[in-house]
Each structure stands twice: as structure tokens, then as C-alpha cells.
């Protein structure tokens, strides 16, 4: 290892230097810092957060919320996040921690904050608040795309209970069997932002949460063939909506080419729902559950969707939020 020079020390301690290039992580955190409505989200959590009393004062709420979002963005467990904050200057800057005068919140503190959000179902309220902020910038249009994605869970019984998670179930997709849960979402057909979500076990059919994924003002509803022939469910929630779900094209040994072409045109719009899943599963890393039970993982899913909406809207709304 090279001897630590003055320039290296300045770079490590302050992050400045003539030869230094801003990293993609720093650029991402700077952009999220501008986009996230911190005051509104803190107002959602504040009624349930510990108040200052005679004992040790609680850590600032916004700081804990920033750390919680860092865990989602970089798919970090509690202990891994604590160590990452000690290791990364860019993360400490985003959170607002100065190691010269204070320490990083430990893993137990992060665990208790997450349990607070789970206990009061604040992940869903954070998702709703971010959705409201996005609606203020770009109102919901007249179409909704509905879809579901599988989130895997450990199927092994080699654990203390010698059993799998009883709230998770298995289902078949094509010729492959999966064990876990399903994340159902409703996405605005114009903006591509998620406005509703439901978490179920994997064996629940896609059509059952359909009414909960509609806001009621739709003119069109898009979905894959799993939602075919569900006009009654759609009109029960959105009376003016037209059914634009994909139709089944194979009849015995023949293929309906007309229906196939129509499905292809619908899928050009329907594909926007995959952008949300790509951010949640590929960028945020939420491909497998981290906790037991649906409630804890649902809280993570709602926060992940809220952050995905902010990420997907960054190009359109960054200019509006810059000082």
C-alpha cells in the first residue's frame, strides 16, 4: 500500500482534489436529494417517531429516513448499511454525518426504525405521499396498466422451524415453479408511474386484486392475457373504462392473427409497467424477500415503489425542483 500523502488525506477526508472525478453514486444521491419531498415524508412519520424527553435524544427523523432510503437504493441489510456509512464519504454526506463529532447509527437503531414503519404501515403512506407529489407535477391520465411480478422467497426447510414461510406460496409460470409472493401494481399509461399496489402470496391469481389497482377515473385499462375477460371487475371500479387487456390468440390449432396484431399494439403501451419492475427488481435488487411474512415485505415493496416513481420521474421534474 502506498504511503498516505497529503493529497490523498484531503481526498479521503474532505472529498476534494484537482484530479478527483464525481462518481455516479454521488450524482445519483445529489439528484435524489433534490427530488425526494423530505418535509412531506417526515410529516408522515413524525407522529409515530419518538419524541425528545429526559433521556438520550432521538436521532433526527430526516437522517433516519435518508438512511432507510439508502438501504433500499443499494439493497443493504442493517449491518451492511452501518458499515457502508463508515466506509463511504458520499453516503455520509447524503445522510449528513460528520465522523469528527458523531457516530453512525448502529444496526439495531436501523432495525427499530424499520419496525416502526412496519408496525404503522408507513411504507404504504410514503408511497401515497410520493404519488401525491408526482400527481401535483403531472396529473394522472385516463389509462391504467395492471400487472404483477413474482418476488422469490427461500423454499428450503433447513432452518430453525424446519418449515417454509407459511405466508408464502408456490405458483407456476410457464413450466417453472416459483415460491414466494406477488407484487401487483397499477401504473399510469402516460407517465409510467405506479399509483397503486397490492402484495399477495404467489398463488393468488393476477385478476383478484384488479379492482384495488384502479383509481376509478380510467378510460382505458391495459393488461396481459391474465386479465382477459374481466370486464365486470373493471367496470365495477371504473364504470367508464374500456377493456384494452390482451386477448388470447390461440384457438386449438390455429392462431388469430388479427387479435395478435391488436395485442402487439396494446403491448407497446403495456410495456411501460416493466420499467417500474426493472427499477424495483434490477436497480434496487428486490428480487427476493428479506423478511418472513407478507407485512414486512409489503412495507419494503411500497417504499421501493415510491423511490422507483421518483427515479423514473427524475428527467421530467428535476428542472422544477432545482433551487
Name these PLM-found stretches.
Residues 44-56:
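Short, Lys/Arg-enriched N-terminal segment that forms or immediately precedes the first helix
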Residues 63-75:
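Alpha-helical support elements that line or immediately flank enzyme active sites
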Residues 1-39, 46-47, 319-322:
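Charged, often Cys/His-bearing segments associated with DNA-binding zinc-finger transcription factors
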Residues 1-3, 7-11, 61, 79, ...:
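Polybasic low-complexity intrinsically disordered regions
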Residues 276-279, 283-286, 309, 313-320:
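Hydrophobic alpha-helical segments
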Residues 54-61, 292-301:
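Structural motif
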Residues 3-5, 10-12, 219-220, 225-299:
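Helix-centered, glycine/charged polyanion-binding patches within enzymatic domains
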Residues 40, 49, 64, 82-83, ...:
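A detector of single, family-specific signature residues
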Amino acid at each position: 500500500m502506498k504511503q498516505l500523502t497529503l493529497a490523498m488525506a484531503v481526498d479521503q477526508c474532505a472529498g476534494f482534489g484537482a484530479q478527483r472525478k464525481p462518481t455516479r453514486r454521488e450524482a445519483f444521491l445529489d439528484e435524489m436529494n433534490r427530488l425526494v419531498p423530505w418535509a412531506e415524508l417526515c410529516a408522515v412519520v413524525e407522529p409515530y417517531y419518538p419524541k425528545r424527553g429526559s433521556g438520550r435524544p432521538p436521532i433526527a427523523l430526516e437522517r433516519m429516513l435518508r438512511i432507510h432510503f439508502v438501504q433500499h437504493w443499494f439493497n443493504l441489510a442493517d449491518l451492511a448499511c452501518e458499515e457502508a456509512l463508515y466506509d463511504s464519504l458520499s453516503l455520509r454526506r447524503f445522510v449528513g454525518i460528520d465522523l469528527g463529532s458523531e457516530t453512525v447509527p448502529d444496526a439495531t437503531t436501523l432495525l427499530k426504525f424499520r419496525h416502526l414503519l412496519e408496525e404503522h404501515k408507513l411504507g404504504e403512506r410514503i408511497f401515497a405521499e410520493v404519488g401525491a407529489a408526482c400527481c401535483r407535477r403531472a396529473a394522472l391520465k385516463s389509462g391504467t396498466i395492471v400487472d404483477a411480478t413474482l418476488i422469490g422467497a427461500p423454499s428450503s426447510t433447513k432452518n430453525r422451524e424446519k418449515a417454509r414461510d407459511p405466508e408464502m406460496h408456490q405458483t407456476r409460470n410457464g413450466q417453472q415453479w416459483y415460491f414466494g409472493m406477488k407484487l401487483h401494481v397499477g401504473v399510469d399509461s402516460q407517465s409510467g408511474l405506479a399509483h397503486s399496489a397490492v402484495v399477495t402470496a404467489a398463488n393468488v391469481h393476477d385478476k383478484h386484486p384488479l379492482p384495488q389497482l384502479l383509481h376509478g377515473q380510467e378510460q382505458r385499462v391495459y393488461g396481459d392475457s391474465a386479465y382477459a375477460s374481466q370486464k365486470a371487475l373493471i367496470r365495477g371500479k371504473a364504470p367508464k373504462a374500456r377493456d384494452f387487456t390482451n386477448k388470447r390468440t390461440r384457438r386449438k390449432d390455429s392462431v388469430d392473427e388479427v387479435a395478435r396484431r391488436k395485442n402487439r399494439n396494446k403491448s407497446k403501451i403495456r410495456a411501460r409497467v416493466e420499467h417500474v419492475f426493472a427499477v424495483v427488481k434490477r436497480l434496487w435488487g428486490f428480487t427476493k424477500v428479506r423478511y418472513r411474512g407478507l407485512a414486512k415485505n409489503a412495507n419494503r415493496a411500497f417504499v421501493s415503489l415510491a423511490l422507483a416513481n421518483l427515479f423514473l420521474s427524475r428527467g421530467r421534474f428535476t428542472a422544477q425542483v432545482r433551487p
